[in-house]
Every structure is written in structure tokens, then in C-alpha cells.
Amino acid sequence: MAAKDVKFGDSARKKMLVGVNVLADAVKATLGPKGRNVVLAKSFGAPTITKDGVSVAKEIELKDAFENMGAQLVKEVASKANDAAGDGTTTATVLAQAIVNEGLKAVAAGMNPMDLKRGIDKATAAVVAELKNLSKPCADSKAIAQVGTISANSDNSIGEIIAEAMEKVGKEGVITVEEGSGLENELSVVEGMQFDRGYLSPYFVNKPDTMVAELEGPLLLLVDKKISNIRELLPVLEAVAKAGRPLLIVAEDVEGEALATLVVNNMRGIVKVAAVKAPGFGDRRKAMLQDIAVLTGGQVISEEIGLSLETATLEHLGNAKRVILSKENTTIIDGAGADTEIEARVKQIRAQIEETSSDYDREKLQERLAKLAGGVAVIKVGAGTEVEMKEKKARVEDALHATRAAVEEGVVPGGGVALVRALAAIIDLKGDNEDQNVGIALLRRAVESPLRQITANAGDEPSVVADKVKQGSGNFGYNAATGEYGDMIEMGILDPAKVTRSALQAAASIGGLMITTEAMVADLPEDKPAAGMPDMGGMGGMGGMM
């Protein structure tokens, strides 16, 4: 095991503070409407220019192991805020820096670190409760656009396109962000339920100009096994042919003579049919088949529930207004499922989202929820260069997270004003002893730091602005973009309550841990021996040169 270097007390905390300040100073330059850019060098290709706090934080590694620990802990603050609300990383970093700097001064002055932390935690809980009281629901499209605009560093076009996407697919709908091919941002919306499986044979295509198979008013046969024997399918095919309706078969697979017979029947016009593989794998496939069954008012033909293909009747089949199959995707439009059953299924998926601890599972469940509840919108980001594209895409993703958070927990006045107004909750708050009171006072000063930093980045005097904002009340604040004071909500400067809350909680959590640090352990740097002179072989016979 490699030898370790151990630092204690003040010398450990001083080193850690250097790392905290290096990372926070780089990140906080990006805060607010007049935040500056940070250029990140890449080992290959052009450097990246960004105003996204978490992107800057991720790039920073320091040479000194103890300083690096401080930097990595602040990076953890940014990623914690990002995980909780998808935004607010820069605000969280600024708050953490203020808490750690003030806290370590108090520790150096002889305060008890544990009591300081208790005071900070008590004050944080009170501020979080006050933020909840300050928040207003974010229901209309205008408010959603304003939140998106602020989060995308005051880019109106991004806020508007996100609001439009949410309007079209609903609050539960999936909105994905992709790189576009033009200069402008574009929005495309897929109505109905779409899954990434296409037709099993090109012979099902009935629109050769677009290479799609379109079925009007089809019946849907949902089967959770492979179909290779046509005899199993005959009873259903005959019943469908009598009904004179098209048929879509969604099964684990359709192969061999079963697929060949379906193709022949389709080409001869005996029965209009198309087949597609069921989406997903394993248990997820079963769940998605059940989703399609609920959406279309059908039943999955499964031996697990005692149903077989031979005994299937028209009552077991789902109904839809239209189905479109391309080579890669299948879209079911206007399924005939009962609203009450769809709502019950949505509720069940929501409960699973709450319970799961896996990010991957959560993402897949969100997709299933969207397919049942709303639809899918794709925002294609347009930009002039590759560098701009990456930067813009990161901002669109941030704005999207922020608007979702706003819909979830409401909005508060932006520009750091909400935290200043939430100070009211801790003006008279008292701890159990004097050291806890110092912790509460410390947080009282720290919550002003985002407002001060936004002002400093705009080139104004932070103390003057902070005092004027504190003298005001309600939504009164400072618009750093225009240099004016006024009602922040009327000026369209809104922050999601969830983002502000998550930023403060992440900063207080890690800030409190850093204040209570007493020892730090790191690997000793290895002393590499100086490289020797290379062998001068082949240089013999030079004796006569003297």
C-alpha cells in the first residue's frame, strides 16, 4: 500500500479552502444574464466555450491532492443540485463557497464546528420552508417560456420552443433534445404512441412513395411469444377477414411460414395485415405490451393468463384510429382504450418511478408514461458551428430541466431575490447555544451571495444592490440584464422553486461536512528518479581527438 500524507486541523482546512475557491471562482463567472464565458481546452479538437456551470466544474482537477479534495467536494455540490433539479448548479456552487468561507473563519475563531453545522442545518430547513410559501404555481405557457429563457442564459427562442413543446405534448410528455442540421431551432411532435420497431417485411408497405405501411381503423393482436406456425393464427385471421378490418400483429417475433402467409394474404388483398416485433426486452417487453393493450382497449394474448392464439377472439383485440409503420418506427394514433384504465396505468407507472433507485429504469418508465399520457416532442437545436452546437444543446437541456422543475413545485422570483426574501424566516431564529447562532447568522449572509454574484458579473456594486433589494418587499428585485429595479415576476425573471431549494440544500449539506473536517488523507506524490543519460554506444574510437 502506498504511503499517505495526512494533514490535520487548520492546515488541512486551509488547503481544502484553496481548492473550493479555485473551482467556485471559475464556475461563478457564468452566473446571471451577464455571466461570462469559460473556455475549456480539449485533448483533441477545438476548445469548448460554455456558460454552463456544471460543465466547467467537471473539467477541473488540481495538482495538489488536498486542494483537489476541496474542489471535488464543491463539484459534488453542483452534481447533487443537477441530479435533484437538473439546474441550479452555479447557484449551488456560489452558496457552498460562501458557507465554507464563512464557516472556516468561525472555526478558526474557536467556534465548535458541530454546533455551527447544527445552526446551518436549522437555518436551511427554515429557509426551505419559506421558499415553499413563496412559490407560485407555474401553469401557463408564458410562465414556462420565462423560466426556460432565464435558465438558458436569457435566450428567448429556447424558452419559447420549450413552452410550445410542453403545450403540444402535455406536462407528462417526453421532450428530447437532438442536434439539428440547420441554423434555427426546430420542433417536431409525434402524436400517439410511438415505439422503435418497424415492419417485419417490406411487403407490408402500402405507400411506396414514403415507404410506410398505413392501416386505417385497424384491430391489434398483441402476443407475448414468437409466432411461427400459421395454424395458430388462422382463427383470428378468419374472424378479422369477416369483419373487413385491417390487422396489426405485435408479437415477440413473427417468422417462417407464419410471416410468409401473412405477406401473401396482404399482397392478394384477402386481409390487410402488418406485423411488428414488440418493443423492449424481457419484463420491459411484457410491460410495454400491456401499455399498448391498455391504450387500445385490447388484451395481451399470454399463456401466463390462460389465453392462447387458437382461442383468441375479436373481443381480445385492441382498436385504434390509425397505425403507421415505417422501417424503424411504429406509431399508434388514437387508441380506443378506456380513459379510466389509462389513468390507472399512468398512476401505476408513476408509483414505480417514485420507488425505483436506478436512473436507467426511471428514464425508461418516464418514456412509457409519456407514451401513455401525452406524446413525444423533439427539439432539434440549430447552430452555425460544432462548438456553438454543443454549448447551445447543453443550455436547452438545462432549460428543459428547469421548466419541468417549475411545473412540479412552482416558481419564485429569480435573480437571487427568493433567497433574500426567505431570510424573513431566520431573522429571529435562535439556536440552542451561541455557536449555533453563529451558524444561523453565517447562512443569513450566505443566502445573499447569488444576488451579489449576479450583480458583480453585470459590473455593478453588489453591496448597494443587495441593500436596496433587502429594503424592498415581495417580488421587488434587480434585473441585471437591464440594470433596473422592479417586480421580478412582471419582468419575467422567474426561477423554479425546486431549483433554488435543491441548490441551497446541496450547498448546506456539503458545506456543513467541510466545516466539520478535522483530518485529510491523500497519497504521497511519488518521487520519480531523474532520467539517466542515454547510452552513447557506437561512439568508441574517439580517443585520438585529444
UniProtKB/Swiss-Prot annotation:
Its main location: cytoplasm. Its EC number is 5.6.1.7. It is an enzyme of class 5 (isomerase). It holds the Pfam family Cpn60_TCP1. The keyword tRNA-binding does not apply. GO terms for cellular component: cytoplasm. Keywords: ATP-binding, Chaperone, Cytoplasm, Isomerase, Nucleotide-binding. Together with its co-chaperonin GroES, plays an essential role in assisting protein folding. The GroEL-GroES system forms a nano-cage that allows encapsulation of the non-native substrate proteins and provides a physical environment optimized to promote and accelerate protein folding. This is Chaperonin GroEL. The lineage of its organism: Bacteria, Pseudomonadati, Pseudomonadota, Gammaproteobacteria, Pseudomonadales.
